Every structure is written in structure tokens, then in C-alpha cells.
């Protein structure tokens, strides 16, 4: 396990072995071969945390979109082809969600070779940026900050669209499903036999 910290003085560190705990003071010092000051290492750490937070925001949005898509598909199975209004509303909602999802991640890349045919999206760019920023024990370059700002803007635009969908489209869809009196449970009839 690797833990990344900047040089500092901590209060204590605790180790537990076979039920017995040991506590000792700990001071984290920089590699003496480095000429980088602690302020530069702190800048690096701070940018890496910001990148991590944007990747987390992206991933959480994708998880919510995919979960909602599964729920829409479940409702579609319950209503069958008879209820065109619910089916069409679900398709419309899914189309909006897909636009956001495809802006944040590359949904068509399945194998490692697929990135040759389908360009990577914001999430992959953020992950690559974290590799660049962490590749040297120094403050991030101005270009790293600029790329982060550009990518963050793209993530924030998409998450704002997502929040708007959650605030308006999802309640409208739920109201339509309620109005159409879609059954919560439906017994599937056997396909044959007696």
C-alpha cells in the first residue's frame, strides 16, 4: 500500500499487531536528494486532490446515470409496448443521459485497442493528468493547472446538466408513470405447457 503525504510533523502513528497497539511520534521528511521545497510538494498534493475529486464526481455521475437507465428499462418491461407515452418519455430521458455519459467517458471502448478508434473523454484525460502531475517531485506546471481548469469546466458543465435532469426530467417522468398507473409488480405468464 502506498500513502502519499507531504513532509510534515504528525502527532503520532499507531500500529496494531496481534491485538496489541503501539503508538509513536512520526515526522515525514522529504528525500534529502530532492531540492524541491515543501511548498512545491504541497502544491502538487493539492492539485492531485482536486483531480481526484473531479474524477470522483465524474464516476458518481456515471453510476447514477447507469442506475437510472436500469430503472427506466425495468419500468419499460412492466408497461410493455402498450404504454407508448411512458416508453417515449423513457427514451427521451435516456437520450439526455447518454449525451452526458458520452461527454464524460468513452462508452464505446471495450478493449485497449478501441481507444484508437474512439477518442478518450474527460474522465480519461483527468486520470492521465494525475499521472503527469505525480510524475515528478515538484510543483505542477502552469500547463497542468490550465489543463485541469479546462477539464474541470467540462465536468462541471455536464454535472450541471445532470443536476437539471434530476431536478426536472426525473420528477416529470415519475409523475407520468404514476398517472399511467404502471403496476409495481407484474406476473410473467409461462411461455407454454400446462
Q: Which ranges hold each PLM region?
A:
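Mature extracytoplasmic or organellar-lumen-exposed domains after removal of signal/transit peptides
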Residues: 24-26, 30, 57-194
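Glycine-centered tight-turn motifs at strand-turn-strand junctions
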Residues: 1-7
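Short, aromatic- and glycine-rich surface loops/edge beta-strands on solvent-exposed regions
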Residues: 7-17
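Short acidic/polar inter-strand loop motif in beta-rich domains
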Residues: 16-24
Amino acid at each position: 500500500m502506498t500513502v502519499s503525504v507531504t513532509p510534515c510533523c504528525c502527532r503520532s502513528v499507531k500500529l496494531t499487531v496481534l491485538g496489541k497497539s503501539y503508538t509513536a511520534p512520526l515526522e515525514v521528511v522529504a528525500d534529502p536528494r530532492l531540492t524541491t521545497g515543501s511548498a512545491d510538494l504541497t502544491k502538487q498534493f493539492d492539485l492531485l486532490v482536486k483531480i481526484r475529486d473531479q474524477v470522483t464526481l465524474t464516476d458518481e455521475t456515471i453510476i447514477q446515470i447507469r442506475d437510472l437507465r436500469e430503472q427506466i428499462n425495468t419500468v419499460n418491461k412492466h408497461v410493455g409496448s402498450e404504454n407508448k407515452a411512458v416508453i417515449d418519455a423513457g427514451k427521451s430521458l435516456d437520450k439526455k443521459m447518454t449525451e452526458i455519459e458520452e461527454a464524460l467517458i468513452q462508452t464505446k471502448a471495450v478493449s485497449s485497442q478501441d481507444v484508437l478508434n474512439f477518442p478518450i473523454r474527460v474522465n480519461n484525460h483527468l486520470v492521465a493528468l494525475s499521472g503527469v502531475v505525480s510524475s515528478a517531485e515538484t510543483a505542477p506546471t502552469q500547463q497542468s493547472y490550465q489543463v485541469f481548469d479546462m477539464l474541470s469546466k467540462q465536468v462541471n458543465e455536464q454535472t450541471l446538466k445532470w443536476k437539471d435532469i434530476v431536478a426536472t426530467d426525473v420528477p416529470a417522468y415519475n409523475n407520468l408513470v404514476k398517472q399511467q398507473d404502471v403496476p409495481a409488480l407484474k406476473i410473467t405468464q409461462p411461455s407454454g405447457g400446462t
